[in-house]
Amino acid sequence: MEGKNIKNIIFDLGGVILNIDYNKTASAFKKIGGNKFDKLYSQFRQNNLFDNLEIGNIESSSFIHELKSALHLSGSDSQIINAWNAMLLDLPKERLELLKSVDKHYQIFLLSNTNKIHYDAYMAYFKTTYQLDFNSLFNKAYYSHEIGLRKPNNDCFEFVLKSHSLNSTE
């Protein structure tokens, strides 16, 4: 895997490192009465409520309140959180080992479109499953809800490159 000019690798989280299934969240919302959830959110599109959550413009509690209102849900906040997190599956041990081996030859970074609710869930999963701090696998991990930027916008990638004086050709 070692390349002559490659010094840095920027990984994505969802669907690359962490297995995800968007349909599980849609199904979970349907079970609690959110039959129109897929009109608001899917793997390929989402409305502004989700965009704002991903770039940290709204708090998790506001997101939950607004989502309940949009879907006319009366369930508890924990039901909403569980449905929202249903898409988060597992992180296979082989991927963890791959990250550890790649780290020996390259600087590795993480750049993920995510939100605080999901972040808390997979951090807890990783700590419980592997007894490790997930972020320790990377030279630096960047999350959209923390940096206020989302992929595929160029400014998101530029932020990471500039933060570490990285050359995009490396």
Predicted ranges, named:
Residues 2-97, 104, 115-121:
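N-terminal helical cap/lid subdomain that shapes the substrate entry/recognition surface
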Residues 112:
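Short beta-strand/turn micro-motifs composed of small residues
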Residues 102-104, 134:
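Short, structurally constrained coil/turn elements
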Residues 97-100, 162:
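Surface-exposed alpha-helical segments enriched in charged/polar residues
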Residues 116-170:
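Substrate-recognition "cap/lid" segment bordering the active-site pocket of phosphatases
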Residues 5-6, 105, 138, 168:
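A structure-centric signal for secondary-structure junctions around beta-strands
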